[in-house]
Amino acid sequence: MSSPSIVTGRNVPVLGRAIPLTWILLLALAVHGSLLLMQLPNDSYDANLHKFFAAHYAQHWLDPWNPKWFTGFSQTTYPPLVHQWMALFSHLLGLNLAYMLVQFIAILLLPVGVYRYARIWVSERAASYAAVGSIFMGSLSFLVYQAGQLPNTLAAALLLNGLPYFYEWAREANWRSLLKGLALVLASAASHHVTLIFGSVLFALPVLFTAIIDRKRDNANSSVAGVISRSAIFAVLMIAGLGVVLFPFWLALYHNPIKQMPIPHASRSNYLTDVEFGLNYWVIPWGAMMLALPFIFVRGLSEKRLRPLFYGFWLTLILGLGGTTPLPKWLLGRFYDVLTFERFTFWGSLMALPLVGLLALVLIEKYGRVASVSLATLAGLTMAVAVAWPVYHQIHEAPFGVSEVISFLNRDGHDKFRYLTLGFGAQLSEVGTYANASSVDGEYNSARLLPELTRYGSAQLTNSKYYGTNGMEALRAVLKHADQYGLKYIFVHDPYYEPLLAFAGWRKEEVYDRGSISLWAKEGILPAHETQYGTRPTALEGVLWGTLPIGSSVLAVLLVLMLSDRRRRSRTLEFPAIDETEPVLREAR
């Protein structure tokens, strides 16, 4: 790394030293380990979605075609690394604990990545403070315990660990750094496609410009052209690797590009006028880090080496504001209506951490223990509020029992027909995970190809009423074509939908979960058959999908362990201690 590092002697006080990385990892274990053992993320918004994907890989590793949603869709539309590791661990731990374990790995990798990323700009001590801060970030707790965005957190952690190797390669032409950086970036891409397409650019550009500024530092003797040419080599190799590792993903995107009406999302709101969404998507994720914004702006603009990082942070900060400013829509174009913007707030928080670590260093140097206690209190409050926030800002109803629904679908040949759930929320994915029958609905919007779902601008049919006229029109269209899809059974957890079902010819037959769920059926429906929507992956694509993405993560681990980092060793020359006793003078002999 290029930032100066202070080698401390034996007499430096504890508050004057960098926090060892081992201690930071133990702190992450202490803070998040108990929450994960309590399985708090199980109630997060997308947790059941990721378990659904993982359950399919656990049973059909080399066949990414999943018939359970949308009358059949290809899981090559979502990078598989997270789900494949969950699938492997699920054979020993079950799906719930497998999810917790992979999330814990992501949480442990994040402070390591933040430390290494921050060391590009700040000292070892400031970087260690930044790494500690990453454990308590409100945006991390928001994604883990409310949003359930496990792929996003793992992809960001892997990317942050890989970019310092890109920095070393660009400045020093170190081939070890090239190999390790490429492997980690490919593993990050195999975890989450949005992090690859948008996050990698936002995180990497400050690193590139800093490498140009630092081309002569620490005995390096590179030219601007040399740094840029090596960066181009890295980019070309990365694109080639992505083309191979994620080939089925690009092929699926080519055959079925996303062409559907935009689906509303609260993160695209104006946070100044919609105060509730501003709290949820900005204030809670940023927490006490908002107090550091003046320092970030002043220090980031005043020092030349920090400006690339600051400009990257500033752009990501603005993007994280969603529809509050027109800039995201101008920059992203049609992607604006596809993306959700809580991920940009997470990335912006990560990019701010090196400067926040620098602020912590300044405060501790000046105020000592008082500053340390104050910073620890603010960090703890930030995380505590973010973890507790879903209790006060509920994103879905309390969980209810769906075991009887699953049992019905799995017996007496009921899985020959398709089904639909209404009012099930995130438990739609739980039913899909364990039921053998196929549904016309599903939670992964980008995989939808049924025209009734793509043309109305609403998300899941199970939540139709929350999308107003568009949602109800989509539901009516599906009910109208029930014969075409073999849709015979509808499970209702919200009486709001019952008049529509009765009018459309369905009849109430049974109730489950002490009357909270009712089963509606329609006579005369023929068994379901395959539809023409979607392109089934070939056997070769299945083999590539089942080996290359997870292989990239294994390769990254092996390269990091086998190719040691080339570190410049420094040695402290300590002055002898001063002896205050009077010297004994003797005559020379």
Predicted regions and their residues:
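Short, polar loop motifs at secondary-structure junctions
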Residues: 423-427, 493-498
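Short secondary-structure boundary/hinge segments and terminal tails
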Residues: 449-450, 500, 519
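Extracytoplasmic/lumenal acceptor-recognition loop(s) of multi-pass membrane glycoenzymes
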Residues: 185, 379-392, 411-484, 526
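Hydrophobic C-terminal alpha-helix "anchor/cap" residues
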Residues: 408-409, 501
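Positions that flank functional sites
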Residues: 447, 497, 516
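Short loop/helix-cap segments at secondary-structure boundaries that form the rim of catalytic
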Residues: 430-434, 499-504
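Membrane-embedded transmembrane-helix bundle of lipid-linked glycan/lipid transferases
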Residues: 2-408, 430-433, 456, 481, ...
